[in-house]
């Protein structure tokens, strides 16, 4: 489970690393898609918390 969550985190991180600079460099793109990026950032933070929680639970068992 932790491996799958980590793989998903890596894929989302890669997508954000590629798309955020492009959106910031394109005139008007950031304003139109800011909400989508905010949701992706929230998902990323949620995954970090989920991975930390899953790792803490699995290491205490």
Swiss-Prot record:
InterPro entries associated with the record: PSII_PsbZ, PSII_PsbZ_sf
Pfam families for this protein: Ycf9
Keywords annotated in UniProt: Chloroplast, Membrane, Photosynthesis, Photosystem II, Plastid, Reaction center, Thylakoid, Transmembrane, Transmembrane helix
Location(s) in or outside the cell: Plastid, Chloroplast thylakoid membrane
Self-association and partners: PSII is composed of 1 copy each of membrane proteins PsbA, PsbB, PsbC, PsbD, PsbE, PsbF, PsbH, PsbI, PsbJ, PsbK, PsbL, PsbM, PsbT, PsbX, PsbY, PsbZ, Psb30/Ycf12, at least 3 peripheral proteins of the oxygen-evolving complex and a large number of cofactors. It forms dimeric complexes.
Main function: May control the interaction of photosystem II (PSII) cores with the light-harvesting antenna, regulates electron flow through the 2 photosystem reaction centers. PSII is a light-driven water plastoquinone oxidoreductase, using light energy to abstract electrons from H(2)O, generating a proton gradient subsequently used for ATP formation.
Family: Belongs to the PsbZ family.
Official protein name in the record: Photosystem II reaction center protein Z
Record lineage: Eukaryota, Sar, Stramenopiles, Ochrophyta, Bacillariophyta
